Amino acid sequence: MYKLIEGDDSKANEEEVTGDPWTILPVKTRKYAKECIEIVLSKRHITKLVKFNDFENLEALWLTNNNLTEIKGLETNFRIKILCLGFNRISSLEGSSLNVMKFLETLYLNNNKLKNLDKVITYLSQFKFLKSLNLFGNPVAEEPEYRPRVVDTLKSLEIFDRHMVTTIERIKAEKIVKEFNDPLSKKHVKRPKRLKVYENFSLIEKNLFNEANQIL
């Protein structure tokens, strides 16, 4: 089995730049491609992945620091276990090549443009073998109770955002998420704004108004 490493291309290009694994093969044969298990195509300004079909035994793919906006072109690479896509421009996971990677164990999506945490973790919940995940630096990381919601949903995770997931953390996360999802939780119930006419109330009316607010 072979491991191919290529990167640090200093030439930037704002136009379409394809990530073609064949360009870095020292021996350009189908046999060599079939036996290749790891490819590194980082820092190459890639905007589109092409010609990965013959790399059917690929297990690890590094695509960090590129210009990818979607995860497409890996539909035949179902054996991938490690996929690193940090520092790209990916905004959605739905309809991506990730769908075929049922054995995925490590997924780095840090510093992308992923939004809507509920959609992201619902999508990622299909990966039963996922052990290490990085979503740091995405808009989703700014959402309320970000880490507890991810930890509670993705039961197989051992490392999240470069930090170990402990049993104690899982127990706490479950409680936090339960409260977060409870529509009756005081933390999420918006109190009505005080009416401007309050100052014109009589003393009795003000007392009644305050009692009503305490009940709410």
Write out the residue ranges for each language-model feature.
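Long, contiguous C-terminal flanking segments immediately downstream of a protein's structured core
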Residues: 1-62, 67, 75, 79-84, ...
